[in-house]
């Protein structure tokens, strides 16, 4: 029986292994779409900071700081990802940091009710660094687990699943939390699920 080799020339993982890798991106990408692009960052800028210009400036400083940290450490991380055999513990740590940080975003509120502004900035910074590190270790797994002839298929599947997961999550949040109580459409619940209160911007923080 011929052994199937990966792009790295090592024995490829089973289909369960490389398809699980693809679904890993489906779990990660919705966070970026929901938090960074469409919902939380605009909420942070306009509501928490209270000044969209200053808010965007703070987000710019966060992104610049994350970029500096990555520039200083990414080569070392890449070397670790390429030379250390076990990458899953690193993925567990980075994904766990993202999950815990995402949970704590619930307490990012305007005024003095939740985390302070600079605590919120620090939390977002940590999450964004963890997200970037998660990408490094996740992407580094592809050459060693995927059969060489299926690398494009698996990579494309991961990209598609990531986008599908992000769009699905966006639609769910819209129809479960954001639109009920605002739009009088017959197929919507009368009130947001889980008792979400729009006046407290809970639909932006959930």
Task: Give the ranges of each region predicted by the language model.
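Cytoplasmic helix-loop-helix junction between adjacent transmembrane helices
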Residues: 123, 129-160
């Amino acid at each position: 029986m011929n052994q199937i080799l990966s792009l790295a020339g090592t024995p490829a993982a089973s289909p369960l292994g490389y398809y699980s890798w693809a679904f890993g991106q489906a779990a990660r990408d919705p966070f970026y779409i929901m938090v960074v692009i469409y919902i939380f960052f605009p909420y942070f800028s306009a509501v928490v900071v209270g000044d969209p210009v200053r808010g965007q400036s703070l987000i710019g400083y966060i992104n610049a700081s994350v970029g500096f940290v990555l520039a200083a450490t990414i080569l070392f991380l890449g070397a670790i990802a390429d030379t250390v055999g076990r990458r899953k513990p690193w993925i567990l740590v980075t994904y766990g940091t993202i999950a815990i940080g995402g949970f704590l975003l619930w307490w990012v509120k305007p005024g003095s009710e939740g985390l302070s502004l600079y605590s919120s900035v620090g939390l977002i910074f940590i999450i964004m660094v963890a997200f970037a590190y998660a990408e490094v270790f996740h992407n580094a797994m592809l050459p060693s687990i995927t059969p060489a002839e299926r690398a494009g298929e698996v990579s494309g599947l991961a990209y598609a699943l990531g986008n599908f997961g992000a769009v699905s999550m966006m639609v769910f949040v819209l129809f479960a939390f954001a639109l009920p109580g605002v739009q009088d459409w017959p197929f919507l619940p009368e009130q947001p699920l889980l008792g979400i209160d729009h006046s407290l911007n809970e639909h932006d923080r959930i």
